[in-house]
């Protein structure tokens, strides 16, 4: 493990960030509201890329391009935050890097969060983004990518698409970093709990508590919107998973693998020990740079 990765892991331990994810629901909601005061929709003002913001189902979607005209291919890229915490400007350098190094436009939806919306509303917005992208770029030219809960949405697009009466073409590639998942069977819960002591970022308790928040009072929520490994990924070109081998969400991997096998979709897995949650999307240290480069190689094919 590199020195920077070791320091980052120590910083997470000392910060007490994990403890916040173990708070009871009321206290957790207050903490989320506090964090969201400094997060949310942003409009880039730099000249490092070409930016456009469109409205989709009443919510903004930022489009990042390397050139004034649309590229031939695009990535639908999702921020993480447990479906409850909004993005910040720290996501922008990663978007520009993806855009520049893959040759793809990057679409970044500011999707509705489950503090105020049911997860089904989130899916309605991001799926409409996907529909617009298929119309513009054509089938086979759109991939999805995301980290944490954004990884769940990147996978969920495919499952949601297969649940439609008239599905669109599936994503060319799906790349996910530490995808979120509400555990849905006893074995998965045991696996996640066993990893909890080794995870310095996310507490297992959050993966249980967040289900109620995601439902937002709605009972008829499809299983795949809460637990992505229950979805049908049939038709996807390929799926690529990146994890820390020492995080709670790594416990869900066997069930995602089973879902890929059921759907006959090729998949790969990369799991590095001692990394923090979603480390790949902070490509400023050795391990993250190496794995981000792998992500770029996948998405530019």
Feature annotation, model-predicted:
Residues 1-67, 236:
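A glycine/proline-hinged amphipathic helix-loop "lid/cap" segment
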Residues 18, 52, 56-62, 68-301:
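Alpha/beta-hydrolase superfamily serine-hydrolase fold, recognizing
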């Amino acid at each position: 493990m590199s020195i920077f990765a070791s320091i980052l892991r120590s910083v997470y331990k000392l910060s007490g960030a994990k403890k916040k994810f173990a708070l009871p629901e009321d206290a957790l909601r207050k903490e989320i509201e506090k964090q969201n005061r400094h997060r949310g929709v942003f409009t880039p003002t730099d000249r490092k890329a070409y930016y456009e913001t469109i409205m989709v189902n009443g919510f903004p979607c930022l489009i990042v391009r390397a050139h004034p005209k649309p590229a031939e291919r695009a990535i639908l890229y999702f921020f993480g935050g447990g479906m409850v915490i909004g993005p910040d400007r720290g996501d922008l350098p990663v978007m520009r890097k993806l855009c520049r190094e893959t040759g793809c436009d990057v679409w970044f939806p500011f999707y509705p969060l489950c503090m105020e919306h049911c997860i089904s509303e989130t899916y309605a917005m991001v799926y409409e983004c996907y529909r617009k992208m298929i119309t513009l770029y054509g089938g086979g030219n759109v991939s999805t990518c995301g980290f944490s809960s954004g990884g769940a949405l990147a996978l969920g697009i495919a499952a949601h698409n297969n649940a439609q009466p008239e599905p669109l073409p599936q994503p060319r590639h799906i790349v996910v970093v530490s995808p979120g998942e509400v555990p849905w069977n006893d074995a998965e819960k045991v696996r996640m709990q066993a990893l909890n002591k080794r995870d310095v970022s996310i507490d297992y308790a959050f993966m249980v508590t967040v289900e109620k928040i995601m439902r937002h009072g709605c009972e008829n929520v499809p299983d795949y919107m809460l637990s992505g490994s229950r979805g049908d990924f049939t038709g996807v070109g390929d799926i690529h998973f990146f994890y820390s081998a020492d995080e709670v969400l790594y416990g869900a991997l066997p069930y995602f693998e089973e879902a890929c096998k059921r759907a006959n979709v090729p998949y790969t897995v990369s799991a590095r020990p001692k990394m923090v949650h979603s480390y790949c999307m902070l490509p400023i240290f050795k391990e993250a740079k190496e794995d981000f480069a792998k992500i770029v190689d996948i998405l530019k094919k």
